[in-house]
A protein has these predicted regions:
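Short conserved segment of the HATPase_c
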Residues: 150-162
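Detector for a conserved hydrophobic position within an alpha-helical segment of the HATPase_c
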Residues: 182-183
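Short alpha-helical Gxxx[C/S/T] motif in the catalytic ATP-binding
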Residues: 175, 179
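Short alpha-helical segment of the dimerization/phosphotransfer core of two-component systems
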Residues: 39-44
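Acidic ATP/Mg2+-coordinating residue in the GHKL
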Residues: 145
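Conserved micro-motifs of the catalytic ATP-binding
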Residues: 58-65, 101-104
């Protein structure tokens, strides 16, 4: 992934240069075509960036510490609430965290939390529920929504890299794959199901 992403950057830079030149054309048809090209070039650049980020995450290892889990989860819940409300979704947060000490990599957990919430916002009709639980066995994050659920195919492939749902082709299909990787790096797992 990283080598492929690196090899794509040079031709994309050349294309971007030509596109910028064409956008300054006096011909309106040429400018319109160049504007469309620019949008596709931007999407390819984001795709290349995602490939590079994915490579780094696949090699990452958790840097856990015994953080203040209770306050950490309050921060997670607050940011999830703001994001959901900003996107017009109702949210119910159930925080079952007690004063317990557990070793977590907070950046890994934050990214998993953010990816799951983002996914739920995309597919929920109107409501999302998040539950945070912690025990000596581990940290549990459950996200559910009132959307139509995963198709049979999506249940099997949702954690594969670059898999996207039918109506969301503008996304790269990396969110749940990243969640899976980070959970596994942390000694956990990602479970996806329809309720």
């Amino acid at each position: 992934n990283a080598a492929f992403a690196h090899d794509l950057r040079t031709p994309l830079t050349v294309l971007k240069g030509y596109d910028e030149m064409l956008q300054s054309s006096s011909d309106s048809i040429t400018r319109d075509i160049a504007e469309t090209m620019g949008k596709h070039i931007f999407r390819l650049e984001r795709y290349v960036d995602s490939m590079s980020q994915l490579h780094r995450l696949e090699d990452a290892r958790p840097q856990g510490d015994n953080s203040d889990i209770k306050n950490f989860v309050i921060t997670l819940a607050d940011s999830a609430t703001i994001f959901c409300e900003k996107n017009g979704k109702k949210i119910c947060v159930q925080n079952n965290i007690t004063d317990i000490s557990i070793c977590l990599d907070c950046s890994f957990v934050s990214q998993v939390n953010n990816n799951l919430i983002s996914n739920a916002v995309r597919y929920a009709k109107s409501a999302i529920k998040i539950t945070y639980t912690c025990s000596k066995e581990g940290f549990y994050l459950t996200v559910s929504d009132d959307g139509c659920g995963f198709s049979k195919e999506a249940l099997c492939k949702a954690t594969n890299p670059y898999f996207t749902g039918e109506n969301h082709r503008e996304h790269f299909g990396l969110g749940l794959y990243i969640c899976k990787i980070l959970c596994e790096h942390h000694g956990g797992y990602l479970k996806i199901e329809n309720c």
